[in-house]
Each structure stands twice: as C-alpha cells, then as structure tokens.
Curated annotation (Swiss-Prot):
UniProtKB keywords: Lipoyl
The protein's name: Glycine cleavage system H protein
Modified residues (N6-lipoyllysine): K65
Gene Ontology biological process: glycine decarboxylation via glycine cleavage system
Superkingdom of the organism of origin: Bacteria
Organism: Synechococcus sp. (strain JA-2-3B'a(2-13))
Cited function: The glycine cleavage system catalyzes the degradation of glycine. The H protein shuttles the methylamine group of glycine from the P protein to the T protein.
Length: 129
C-alpha cells in the first residue's frame, strides 16, 4: 500500500507535517513516520501556552519499536493540543493528517515555512531512504 502525502500540506525532514490556516499551523506526523514507528503506545505533547522553538523537541511518540522525539518545524505558541491522541495513542495511525493532528501553534515567524518542502519533495526524500 502506497503511503499518502497530501499536497496541501508542507513537510520537514524530521517527518512532521504542517497545515497552515491563517496564522495557525496544525502540526502532526506523516504517514511515513507512523508506518516506521509501528504500534504507537504513548504520545507526549506540551501544554497549551507553551512556546516552542523551530528545530527543538516539543514532545515524543513511543511505539513498541522506539521512542522518537517530535521536532518543531516552526516557532510559536501552542494554542491547542489534541488530547484524543494522548488518551488513545493508537488512534494516531488511523488518520495522521486529520483526526491524528498533534498540536496547533500560532506562527511566530512566517519565514520558518520557507524551510519546509512540498509533498512531492517529501515523497522523494522518504522513498529514497
């Protein structure tokens, strides 16, 4: 089964995606990351109001295979946390680009988005790995 990378999203090489809605970025992990992790058993996310910095860890995802840090693709303030994936981590695999989003961030520096890639570029990155 081919993994999907929706074209309306932006991606980073640490396997997070960004969906921009005005000055808010919805951040989650890609289908590739979910596939590589396997069965997800824990998701640790920051609280609302937390300031995150581009390139820094903002949480973690634990699976039966590994514990992986989540890296902020941009800087800003966390304005919403998806408590549903914290309470039911396995649900992240069901819809990573929809109900499986992780956090929403008020974008501090729109220039941060210049370092993201298209779905096509991200697909080339992961398919070449």
């Amino acid at each position: 089964m081919a993994l999907e990378y929706p074209s309306h999203l932006r991606y980073v090489d640490t396997h997070e995606y960004i969906h921009v809605e005005d000055d808010i970025a919805v951040i989650g992990i890609t289908a590739y990351a979910v596939d590589q992790l396997g069965d997800i058993v824990f998701v640790g996310l920051p609280e609302e109001g937390t300031e995150i910095e581009k390139g820094e860890s903002f949480g973690s995802v634990e699976s039966v295979k590994a514990v992986e840090d989540l890296y902020a693709p941009l800087s800003g303030e966390v304005v919403a946390v998806n408590t549903a994936v914290v309470e039911s981590p396995e649900s992240l695999a069901d819809d990573p680009y929809g109900d499986g989003w992780l956090i929403k961030v008020r974008i501090a520096n729109p220039e941060d988005l210049e370092d993201t890639m298209s779905a096509e570029a991200y697909a080339s990155l992961v398919e070449g790995s």
